[in-house]
């Protein structure tokens, strides 16, 4: 595996600011939440195009299993510029990210059968949450 380029926050922010036509909030949010990072906070994507390429690469890997699956470039064109497909936040950060373990879901529903407002009910809900987030 070839080493990835590590960017500073300022490098990614400036490149993203240009990508988002000067929208400071969009650039800050993208770098802070969605740019590929390792568990030490090192940034490996300069702009959302890098993220879209990562997503397209991973989705194309799955598509290759099907007779008429889409190619990486076809998927990238749908994602590029947030024009046709805009993934939710957790998938944008997590798909193709082999540096951190994270959820690809933005929402979980935890059951509330019985008496949820009791020690036993609270412990059962905690146990369900641990099971949802456990990684081995």
Label every model-predicted segment.
Residues 1-136:
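Extended catalytic cores of very large enzyme megasubunits
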């Amino acid at each position: 595996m070839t080493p990835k380029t590590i960017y500073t926050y300022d490098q990614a922010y400036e490149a993203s600011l240009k990508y988002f036509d000067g929208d400071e909030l969009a650039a800050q949010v993208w770098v802070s939440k969605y740019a590929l990072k390792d568990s030490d906070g090192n940034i490996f994507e300069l702009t959302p195009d890098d993220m879209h390429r990562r997503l397209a690469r991973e989705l194309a890997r799955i598509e290759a299993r099907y007779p008429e699956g889409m190619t990486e470039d076809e998927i990238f064109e749908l994602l590029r510029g947030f024009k046709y497909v805009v993934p939710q936040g957790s998938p944008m950060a997590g798909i193709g990210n082999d540096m951190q373990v994270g959820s690809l879901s933005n929402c979980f529903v935890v059951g509330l059968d019985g008496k949820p407002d009791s020690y036993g009910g609270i412990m059962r809900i905690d146990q369900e949450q641990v099971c949802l987030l456990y990684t081995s």
